[in-house]
């Protein structure tokens, strides 16, 4: 009896941690849309600018795919759960929006899948799903979490757009190019990502990137948390 109770509690904990359905993971129908769109951003954001612009900032875990909205460029909706909050009052479970869907996605920006951990800078949005939030600056401010073997957590700026803005404004020198990191560390990050998202893990190799005009950068969690703490103090 005790073993059965323990098994039940463990299963319940896993469902809570992943925000994925207890009836089975619901993933998007495709990761890459039928058409490839080219993004034209009105502006880019440094980490500090995105933090100040956002209603809420948090490390979140993507859960089940909920659906899509067509009309113009598609939007996809997911369940998501807060792992750690840095700004604002984001509900523990909420709806995360992503630009892209089955009809089309941006180049080198696949749809999320259950288990992705993201550091996101969010604004409240109007949608048919409850507690919906979308990223400030679309994909340009989405940072993917990955852990090295020694426990160091890194955040991957896959397109380097936030990092480029850091260099323009001189806000900080928080980031470093992925290409300059030790090869062993990059392999460790790729292996960690492969646990939940093999497609994302492949993108860590610059030779496998379809869009070679962008260079990935990485931040350490410690560096970003120090920045966020200073911004919260005002």
Regions found by a protein language model. Give the residues of each.
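C-terminal motif of bacterial Sec signal peptides marking the signal peptidase cleavage site
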Residues: 16-19
